[in-house]
Amino acid sequence: MKKKLYEGSSKILYSAEEDFLLIMAFSDKAILETGEIVDISGKGVLNNNISSFLMDKLEMIGIENHFIEKINMREQLIQYVEVFPIQVIISSVACSRFVKEFGIDEGYVFDKPIIDFKVRSREFKYPIVNEYQILNFGWLTRDEIKAVKEQALRIYDFLSGLFIGVGIRLVECKLEFGRVFNGEESIIMLTDEISPDNCRLWHINSNEKLGFELLEKEPNKVFESYQLIADRLKEK
């Protein structure tokens, strides 16, 4: 019988029969800026489908990731990864904090994608952390930071092209990475998910917001938006 190991705001991790494997289940829960948790019926099923599809695509271009296979509508089998305590945020268009903190016009397109690191902690409200702090805290080595940045940009470039092909702009995405050990050596591996929960997606022509950005102002449109993204990706 599988044992619950961890429950987050939108996913649950369970033990699997084999060592170093886990079962990741996608729930319908979503967290608002106020901290309130709401249910969007069917969201977990769509996120499982979308993330499975995108992780498979990334594997095809040589991006190591934790996804192994989809088990059922809500669950997937994943590789155990020692997850880094940081999130990697890649942005190519001014949104969110760039508008609030720097006064940049929303929608302004950057010359090159910008990478930010945040501490992976809801308790501390995901503060920005720089490379020198990451090194001094002992979270990653210099080589690991370099590898994470290179992989993050490659992933973002690939996903941007894929989404453009279905009429959607990838404005920003949040990625998580970790280590997988093979004897004394380790490799950097993409983990978590890639879905409308952690990607900022806009209609390419109208800049109409899709995915999680609708939670606060238009919650009744959230499922429809996730379904649209899933349907568009089926065309690829």
Curated annotation (Swiss-Prot):
Known EC number: 6.3.2.6
GO molecular function: ATP binding; phosphoribosylaminoimidazolesuccinocarboxamide synthase activity
Protein's name according to its UniProt entry: Phosphoribosylaminoimidazole-succinocarboxamide synthase
Keywords from the UniProt entry: ATP-binding, Ligase, Nucleotide-binding, Purine biosynthesis
Pathway(s) the chain acts in: Purine metabolism; IMP biosynthesis via de novo pathway; 5-amino-1-(5-phospho-D-ribosyl)imidazole-4-carboxamide from 5-amino-1-(5-phospho-D-ribosyl)imidazole-4-carboxylate: step 1/2
GO cellular-component term (any): cytosol
Family: Belongs to the SAICAR synthetase family.
InterPro entries: SAICAR_synt/ADE2_N (IPR028923), SAICAR_synt_PurC (IPR033934), SAICAR_synthetase (IPR050089)
GO BP annotations listed: 'de novo' IMP biosynthetic process; cobalamin biosynthetic process
Chemical reaction(s) catalysed: 5-amino-1-(5-phospho-D-ribosyl)imidazole-4-carboxylate + L-aspartate + ATP = (2S)-2-[5-amino-1-(5-phospho-beta-D-ribosyl)imidazole-4-carboxamido]succinate + ADP + phosphate + 2 H(+)
Protein's UniProt keywords contain Ligase: yes
Highest classification ranks of the organism: Bacteria, Pseudomonadati, Pseudomonadota, Alphaproteobacteria, Rickettsiales
One Pfam family recorded for the sequence: SAICAR_synt
PANTHER family with a match to the protein in the record: MULTIFUNCTIONAL PROTEIN ADE2, SI:DKEY-6E2.2
